[in-house]
Amino acid sequence: MKYELQKTDGRARRGRLVFERGVVETPAFMPVGTYGTVKGMTPEEVKETGAQILLGNTFHLWLRPGQEIMKLHGDLHDFMQWHGPILTDSGGFQVFSLGAMRKIKEEGVHFKNPINGDSVFLSPEKSMEIQYDLGSDIVMIFDECTPYPADWDYAKRSMEMSLRWAARSRQRFDELNNKNALFGIIQGGVYEDLRDVSVKGLVDIGFDGYAVGGLAVGEPKEDMHRILEHVCPQIPEDKPRYLMGVGKPEDLVEGVRRGIDMFDCVMPTRNARNGHLFVTDGVVKIRNAKHKDDTATLDEHCDCYTCRHYSRAYLHHLDRCNEILGARLNTIHNLRYYQRLMAGLRQAIEEGKLEHFVEDFYGRIGKPVPPLNV
């Protein structure tokens, strides 16, 4: 993987990630394919929305169908028939989400398999081996996602263990002679001094890119913005920056303003299945009765398959009838909305007009522009 920084506008960056499997224009949004599928979508449909890279979930794919089934097909690309780049998370966040079902120790995490109750162990080394078998174009180190709220002492211990796990991840990745990219994950909760230690430790180890983890876990938006403003300038300029698990359209805009290059989130797909659709002027809740006889298209500014063919009334009808097609059409639209948003941000950075874009974006959805303290 090679990262090329092409243009900046303030802290915002316009670049590209070059892989053997294709080019990813940044800032980029990665649809989430947890189980080897973006829910309800064929790979061709996902590509048509403008997506150039997907996210796969190491934890879930390891538990089901497992490494051996994957290797029978070649790797995850062959298994799911997506031949563009794939980033896989390490499983750290999913283990963190298990709560009482897991025990975190220095060697790794012991937990109960949520599918069948078996005792399972996941370590930095095992995560690197699984992601190697998946053929991930971007491998994420195994870390502990520091919860929110966490006091300074807990966040410090968690961050320090994540640094030790980062070094172990790096070592096992190199032992496997993996030629793909390995990203470090910056932890430290909402504490700037801990984030400083994490960034320096990871840069000293050396990675192909750096993710900001432990945000979008319940902290106030002001804290997310503050941490990004503090951390991003410390990340080497020639390496991509990835904000994990984010987020709402406004979060993507604010991340880009602060120097983030990559995002992922289940929001566009999950919300689509619940009739919550993103449009240029905000949100349409297609389940609401007012759309029953609305012959208008979902978003007159959108060029997706759904908006080119169907009315709000039809989408409302499908949702009320629990038709699978409704969830699919909604997903196509939401994914395209996110990709159009990213394309707009990229163009604005190229033209040196990012803040004009930001003002227009917030004006359309009727919200004030958050302050930028950089």
From Swiss-Prot:
Organism whose genome encodes this protein: Yersinia pestis
Cofactor note: Binds 1 zinc ion per subunit.
InterPro entries referenced in this protein's UniProt entry, alphabetically: ArchSynthase1/Queuine_TRR, TGT, TGT-like_sf, tRNA_ribo_trans-like
Required cofactor(s): Zn(2+)
Binding site residues for substrate: D89, S90, G91, G92, F93, D143, Q187, G214
Protein family: Belongs to the queuine tRNA-ribosyltransferase family.
The organism's taxonomic lineage, starting at the top: Bacteria, Pseudomonadati, Pseudomonadota, Gammaproteobacteria, Enterobacterales
GO biological process, one term: tRNA-guanine transglycosylation
Pfam families in UniProt: TGT
Gene behind this protein: tgt
E.C. numbers: 2.4.2.29
Source superkingdom: Bacteria
PANTHER family: QUEUINE TRNA-RIBOSYLTRANSFERASE
This protein's name: Queuine tRNA-ribosyltransferase
Swiss-Prot/TrEMBL keywords: Glycosyltransferase, Metal-binding, Queuosine biosynthesis, Transferase, tRNA processing, Zinc
